Amino acid sequence: MPRELVNAKITHVSYVDKAANQKQFFIVKSEKQPDFQKEVRILAKEADEQKLVYGIVYEPDTVDAHGDFMTAAEIEKAAHGFLKDARQIDKQHDFQGGVGEVVESYVAPADFEMNGETIKKGSWVLVTKASEEVWEQIKKGEITGYSMAGTAETIEKQEKPVSQEKTDEKGLFNLLKNFFVGKQQQSYEEPVAKAGRKFSASNLQEIKNAHAALGNLLSQVETKEGEEEMTSEEVTKSIQEALEPIKKRLETLEKEEELNKKDKEKEEETEKEGEKLKKAISEAVQPLADRIEAIEKSRGTSKQTEESGSEQVQKSIWSGLF
């Protein structure tokens, strides 16, 4: 993710050699640790008697190798601040002066070319006059560019704006994928219980088929996403088609549940009616049983044992009815 550099304060410009060319331009934080690097090429070298060296310090809105960039306004602030408060030129960041001096420092007012190099509008161009020693190193190719030292604040920037609609669609697909293809997948391999009843094997197979259909939909969407973006209408239609089998099966299950509920209610009603009938018969027969018992008690003792056995048989018969 690119970082925007703001409020940069450049304190030194160094001549650097080829070995340091990979880290020619850098800005450090307040702890004086490097934050990013950018190669700055020397664009032109004037006649020996002048020893003038031209270079681009920074281009606006151009992300460097370390993912940093500056706007034209921030570059202008940094360039003006350096010219006003610093103007320090050293070599290899040794912070020892006397090796060069600032001749020109300006921000390009328009695009132009210099020695075949296109200078972009808003770029910071620096011209320095090198010392005799440094000039000889430049001619030999031992000094190849500038390196800047200073401080800057950073702001994280999103690399590419994403519309809310696309974000919502991607979030929906991820949600479906995680639910139907992720950890939940293993739960389908075991019986699914609901309200104290288990789904039958056929019902479970229907759910598995619907799960497979949704998985196929997700695969198609992911493939199509790599080729072209789907519209909201296409997304809605695809999901509705994939959910249609589940909707139909759910309606069937609800109807079956309703029928089972009605059957259970009928069974409970029948049991209640049976209990009422049993109670009515028991109440109607009980007076007869009482009268028989009274008659048997009034008979003689000689037949008491025999009649008692008969009474027990009769009572057991009555008892068996209820």
Swiss-Prot record:
Region feature Disordered, mapped onto this chain: 254-322
Coiled-coil regions listed in the entry: 205-286
Keywords, comma-separated and alphabetical: Coiled coil
Skewed-composition ranges (Polar residues): 310-322
Biased composition (Basic and acidic residues): 254-281, 290-299
Pfam family, one: Peptidase_S78_2
Family (UniProt): To B.subtilis XkdF.
Name of the protein this chain belongs to: Uncharacterized protein YqbD
